[in-house]
A protein has these predicted regions:
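Alpha-to-beta junction loops
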Residues: 72-83
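Hinge/lid segment of periplasmic solute-binding proteins
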Residues: 87-142
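Sec/Tat signal peptide C-region and signal peptidase I cleavage site
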Residues: 16-21
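Short helix-initiation/N-cap motifs at beta->coil->alpha
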Residues: 59-68
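Positively charged n-region of N-terminal signal peptides that target proteins for export
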Residues: 1-4
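Short, polar/charged alpha-helical segment
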Residues: 32-54
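Short, well-ordered beta-strand elements
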Residues: 22-32, 53-58, 80, 133
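Bacterial N-terminal signal peptides
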Residues: 8-15
Length: 144
């Protein structure tokens, strides 16, 4: 849990400076209790440290999100959203709906001092055409 919270805090802090003010829109389907609590803690901490930024969270149920993402990315894209890596994100990358975040992967000042080393196992699924299109925030083991 501590690693998730540190990761979330770092992700929210990336790309924001004291000159940024306004609303940060986040679309997600993280409704499970532990991740939801970690995100809420990180959002509250971020807002304490950035009073000029308001976080607007649009939380969808898991199945509804799978349909909604196709609509909101083309009509009213959020600043931040979560999705699957690899082939699941490929259509959105090809359509130009996802921002290249390779610069964050090459930054050595993230959480444990080196995102590339600390999350090297997640880099390949996030890489399309030699660029990274996402930042991992958690890890789920789906099989044994």
């Amino acid at each position: 849990m501590k690693k998730i919270i540190a990761t979330l805090t770092a992700i929210l802090a990336m790309g924001f400076s004291s000159s940024f003010a306004g609303t940060l829109v986040i679309n997600t389907d993280l409704t499970d209790p532990a991740p939801k609590a970690a995100f809420e803690w990180a959002f509250n901490k971020f807002q304490e440290e950035n009073p000029d930024v308001t976080i607007e969270v649009n939380n969808f149920d898991h199945e509804g999100y799978k349909q909604a993402i196709r609509n909101f990315l083309t009509t009213s894209p959020p600043d931040v959203f979560n999705w699957y890596a690899g082939n699941r994100m490929l259509p959105f990358v090809r359509a130009g709906l996802v921002e290249d975040v390779s610069d964050i992967w090459s930054d050595t000042g993230w959480v444990d001092g080196n995102l590339t080393e600390g999350m090297s196992h997640a880099k390949k699924p996030m890489t399309i055409g030699g660029k990274q299109w996402g930042i991992p925030y958690t890890y789920y083991q789906w099989g044994v």
